Amino acid sequence: MEMASGGGAAAAAGGGVGGSGGGGGGGDEHRQLHGLKFGKKIYFEDAAAAAGGGGTGSGSGSASAAPPSSSSKAAGGGRGGGGKNKGKGVAAAAPPPPPPPPRCQVEGCGADLSGIKNYYCRHKVCFMHSKAPRVVVAGLEQRFCQQCSRFHLLPEFDQGKRSCRRRLAGHNERRRRPQTPLASRYGRLAASVGEHRRFRSFTLDFSYPRVPSSVRNAWPAIQPGDRISGGIQWHRNVAPHGHSSAVAGYGANTYSGQGSSSSGPPVFAGPNLPPGGCLAGVGAATDSSCALSLLSTQPWDTTTHSAAASHNQAAAMSTTTSFDGNPVAPSAMAGSYMAPSPWTGSRGHEGGGRSVAHQLPHEVSLDEVHPGPSHHAHFSGELELALQGNGPAPAPRIDPGSGSTFDQTSNTMDWSL
């Protein structure tokens, strides 16, 4: 009984120990979790050994639990020490010193430029020395150029222009640059337009001549039987076969071209004056090319006359006059070209295609009659141009002592020497 009781006590004691061991095991689990938290490896003994020696287990548990605490303290101390070291390193690094303020680079000045404009701070010159005529920089006499913002030697600087010579040379080169091709093209175009306008006005003025009435009234009237300069006397006779003149409304006018040195000045006599007989070009310029270009260059087709051509010829012949001295109206002059005459023959209205200028060789301007001291007159210029369509014909010349007659029936002129 005693042994049993003793065994029970021992068992109780063992249970107590086991309880304590179980309690220690519960603490070990907590410590194991804590050890796992800090990364420590935990080795488990055999179950028998753990059951046989709870104290040993508890001792081992305490021993295993001790290192994590120490390690945790060491880790905590290490973190704390590291923090302290880091703080000491930041406090030890001093901030960089501020840059020195910009100062004037002129010797003897050294003015602080931190409170003025950025232009002077960038070029390191004060306001006073930027305009000074002479300063010393780097041991040399120079002057600050505000055009290029640099210091130049005195020979390189123009005191009058207040600029360096290199800058002035570039400025003058830009000013003397030649004009662009576009501007020169516009200038030539404007000049050509002006020339064209002047040429057009010139053409209009000479294409439509206008003779004032005062000049027309000032022309001397030539009466039948009057003697004009050069000794040419005009006679007006009515021929039996004469056609009525559409110009002045009178009968046909005749003139004689016979004369000699003994009988006096030559007097023209001949057949009837054709209806178109008039003096063209009176009061015109001495150059007969204008009158010829207006009268003879344009061919007139009598079968296909237009009103416009008649109007142009009437305007061109507005300054003509008949042989008897009366001014001729343009409409009557245009009608006279349409009238038949012995000069044109029967082909005047039927031939068609021959110009009136070729059919009227008698038309002579006053400018073509050249009086001389020997009282002779000759036809030139217009007579040759009028006959050039039918072939070359020599210009008739009437000299003193020679006569010429015109045969109306055969339409031929005989010249006697």
Swiss-Prot record:
InterPro entries: SBP-like, SBP_dom, SBP_sf. GO terms for molecular function: DNA-binding transcription activator activity; sequence-specific DNA binding; zinc ion binding. GO terms for cellular component: nucleus. Residues 1-32, 51-102, 387-417 are annotated as: Disordered. This is Squamosa promoter-binding-like protein 14. The SBP-type zinc finger is required for the binding to DNA. One of its GO terms (biological process) is positive regulation of DNA-templated transcription. Keywords: DNA-binding, Metal-binding, Nucleus, Phosphoprotein, Transcription, Transcription regulation, Ubl conjugation, Zinc, Zinc-finger. It comes from the Eukaryota. A zinc finger (SBP-type) spans 101-178. Pfam families: SBP. PANTHER family: SQUAMOSA PROMOTER-BINDING-LIKE PROTEIN 4 (PTHR31251), SQUAMOSA PROMOTER-BINDING-LIKE PROTEIN 6 (PTHR31251:SF226). Residues 1-26, 51-60, 75-84 have a biased composition (Gly residues). Its main location: nucleus. Residues 402-417 have a biased composition (Polar residues). Coiled coil: none annotated. Zn(2+) 1 binds at C104, C109, C126, H129. Expressed in young panicles. Expressed in the shoot apex at both the vegetative and reproductive stages. Highly expressed in the promordia of primary and secondary branches. Highly expressed in young panicles. Interacts with PCF1 and PCF2. Interacts with IPI1. Interacts with D53. Interacts with SLR1. Interacts (via C-terminus) with SHI1.
